[in-house]
Amino acid sequence: MDRKAGEDDWEDSGAETGGSDYSRLSSTSSELSVDDTQDPFLVSIHVITDPGESRCLQEAIDRLLAWIHPDLQLFRVSERRVSKKRKPVKSFVSHPALAIILFLQEAYGEDQILHLHKCFQKPPWQFHHTERVHGKFLPYMPCNQDFFTLANGTPLWAIRQVHYGKEIIRFTIYCSYENFADMMKMYELILKKRVWRKKTDFCVFPVYSNMDFDIEFSLKRLAKGQKPVPLESSLLEFRVRDFGQLIPLLPNQCSPISEGRWKTEDHDGNKILLQQAQCLARKTTWKHQNYLSRNPAMTQPLSIAPRNRKFKSGKHKGRAGNGQVQHFGGSQMDFPRGQTDTLRSLKVPSESVQPFQRSKSLYCLPTTSDFPSCDSFPISETHLCFGQETYETPVWRSSPRINIDDLEGVEETDVDTGMKLSSSDLSVISAYSPLNGLCSDLEASLPSHGALSHSNTLPYDSLHSLSHISSSSCSVFPSATGASTLTQAHILGHYHQSSETTSHLSETLNVQEEEEEFYI
């Protein structure tokens, strides 16, 4: 694309900017949202692979996202029953239509980003291309403009640095020059979010925001003559609330593939899925809440093991000069009685461990619903901070598999072949649909009332089982890895305190509006 030499005319490519005013606005992105309820799984991606390749690709994606948060399972990989032959694409006039860019804090150390770049050099990752960007340059590490892919027909991936601000997961759709404006209006309808950052060839929609990271959805206009190539093995899925109001406004025909899911295309031919935003059944949610109210021991914070970050000296130094441990991103919490044994069983010296919570802003209480929704419960955010500097490999877990027994009688259209499928041979299943068997599985995994009356300590094995079920239901219930299970009253007080913290942070960030960096 031809660009003017003037610095003011520099256009943001969308795939290489992070931090700066984007991050400052993201802390107050809920003010710009049409729908006040935040959902970290509002946008997700389905990847369809040839037989025998799904496990390898799913693990590669999970390892990558674990550097930001292990519970962010935004990608689901499934297999088609027969391998698909693909036609070669002329690369000099085409560009893959979808990319995922991870913006990581350089304050955690360059070793982290270098490690991820080394991961891209190993299978199943494949080098795709290097992007050339014009404009204002800042010092960056090698390979900062490289894009990689997992397989043909899957999205591009890239790692970028963030000098300040929060870490970002950004979904980017590359649009044709002619359709950029129309697609911006279409996705504004689907997301029910206003564009809060826009340039002539780039715009950003806020999807989810907390104190540590943002999830964004962006559109990038290609130059004249370039054509975005829709990915034949990947589909974007969006949670929507009102099918009846949305479907007549979309540019292309919508066809149902199941009771709660529809498929359609955007102006450039990208296949997208629309899922009815459903919460767990009232019975299941209230069962969980009533269980917590009957068992106060379950409401106490429990910290299990440290996560993946290395706190460096200086900005992120773990121990202050007076010998006391500093707590980052949240308030200090003491261990409840009975958890000392849990720490000892993990072989962690209790005197060297202090729990802290990175973020409180994941607690999002519903404002209009009369019963708790999926957004009322947090992704697990409690971690342990060590006084001594240690470097830990990111803790990640593979995505839970869907129990086919819970889908008895279900019929759905295969989004890959268009054929009707029964529950016995479903090859493409939404990982975020509520499962009928969740209530019984959850109740079976929880300890009995009598067991809790004798001890306030929750066994690690039982807690791990609960965490596994939690992750399969899009983190509806707090995850076990350092999660704090709270009653509704505790959550409400926690929410008010978080709102005051976020408000104070927004006022501080507004003072810095004159600073701006473009991350290339």
UniProtKB/Swiss-Prot annotation:
Family, per entry: Belongs to the FAM124 family.
User: Which source organism?
Assistant: Xenopus laevis (African clawed frog)
- What InterPro entries does the database record attribute to this sequence? FAM124 (IPR029380), FAM124_dom (IPR046365)
Which ranges are annotated Low complexity under compositional bias?
20-32
Do you know which Pfam families this protein is assigned to?
FAM124
Segments for region (Disordered):
1-34, 311-334
What gene name is given for the protein in this entry?
A: fam124a
What is the protein name for this chain? Answer: Protein FAM124A
